[in-house]
């Protein structure tokens, strides 16, 4: 199960990113968080932007509402989805874990 927290009315969870993949997608669970494949290379913040875009599409919100709180230069990232409660996020992320 995905470990979700709530911070100021926004869902927060951990993501393990795998850059330079053949396509961008959510793969499933990884140590209480989500594992994602990202097509972009980790250069010039491209993989971080793609990670935010991936979750914005998944939650059907603008990319500006998805933030990486920590791990900008790491494969393990803490992601916040602004304006989405942890309960609502759990429903969206349920198919992945």
From Swiss-Prot:
GO terms for cellular component: cytoplasm. InterPro entries: DUF167, YggU-like_sf. It comes from the Bacteria. Gene3D superfamilies: YggU-like. Pfam families: DUF167. Belongs to the UPF0235 family. HAMAP family: UPF0235. This is UPF0235 protein Ppha_2415. The lineage of its organism: Bacteria, Pseudomonadati, Chlorobiota, Chlorobiia, Chlorobiales.
């Amino acid at each position: 199960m995905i470990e979700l927290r709530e911070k100021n009315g926004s869902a927060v969870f951990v993501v393990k990113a795998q850059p330079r993949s053949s396509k961008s997608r959510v793969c499933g669970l990884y140590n209480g968080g989500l594992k994602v494949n990202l097509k972009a290379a980790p250069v010039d913040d491209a993989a971080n932007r793609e990670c935010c875009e991936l979750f914005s599409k998944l939650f059907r919100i603008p990319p500006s509402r998805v933030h990486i709180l920590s791990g900008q230069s790491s494969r393990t990232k803490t992601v916040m989805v602004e304006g989405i409660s942890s309960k609502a996020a759990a429903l969206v992320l349920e198919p992945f874990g």
